[in-house]
């Protein structure tokens, strides 16, 4: 099993799909990595040579921010918004939608479950 950026890639999948298991690499980035390293995109992970795995690992380490580094940067950006007190930071702090969505109805994903209100007796 190939291990790149701290992630075990599934052996049976094509390398293009397997690279998307790494946080921060989607389909287009995976295609770019494969093109730059010269690996055949139809190759299964189990069929990769050790040199190809090393080339992929080297390219990802040198050129991309993935996994823990990327998660840390995203969290720092959100924390910075909250510290400077801008509108987006306030929305993050209050747990409300940040990008202008309505909140009169919906927005349950960000707001959490509705508070229980007791039924009225007649």
From Swiss-Prot:
GO terms for cellular component: cytosol; small ribosomal subunit. PROSITE patterns: RIBOSOMAL_S13_1, RIBOSOMAL_S13_2. Keywords: Ribonucleoprotein, Ribosomal protein, RNA-binding, rRNA-binding, tRNA-binding. The keyword tRNA-binding applies. Located at the top of the head of the 30S subunit, it contacts several helices of the 16S rRNA. In the 70S ribosome it contacts the 23S rRNA (bridge B1a) and protein L5 of the 50S subunit (bridge B1b), connecting the 2 subunits; these bridges are implicated in subunit movement. Contacts the tRNAs in the A and P-sites. One of its GO terms (biological process) is translation. The lineage of its organism: Bacteria, Bacillati, Actinomycetota, Rubrobacteria, Rubrobacterales. Residues 94-122 are annotated as: Disordered. Disulfide bonds: none annotated. This is Small ribosomal subunit protein uS13. One of its GO terms (molecular function) is structural constituent of ribosome. Belongs to the universal ribosomal protein uS13 family. The keyword tRNA-binding applies. Part of the 30S ribosomal subunit. Forms a loose heterodimer with protein S19. Forms two bridges to the 50S subunit in the 70S ribosome. InterPro entries: Rbsml_uS13_C, Ribosomal_uS13, Ribosomal_uS13-like_H2TH, Ribosomal_uS13_bac-type, Ribosomal_uS13_CS.
């Amino acid at each position: 099993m190939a291990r790149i950026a701290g992630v075990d890639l599934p052996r049976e999948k094509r390398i293009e799909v397997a690279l998307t298991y790494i946080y921060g690499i989607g389909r287009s980035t995976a295609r770019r990595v494969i093109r730059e390293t010269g690996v055949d995109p139809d190759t299964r992970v189990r069929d990769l040579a050790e040199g190809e795995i090393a080339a992929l690992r080297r390219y990802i380490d040198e050129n991309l921010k993935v996994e823990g580094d990327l998660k840390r940067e995203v969290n720092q950006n959100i924390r910075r918004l909250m510290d400077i007190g801008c509108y987006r930071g306030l929305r993050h702090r209050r747990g409300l939608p940040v990008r202008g969505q309505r909140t009169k109805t919906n927005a349950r994903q960000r707001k959490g479950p509705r508070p229980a209100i007791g039924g009225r007796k007649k």
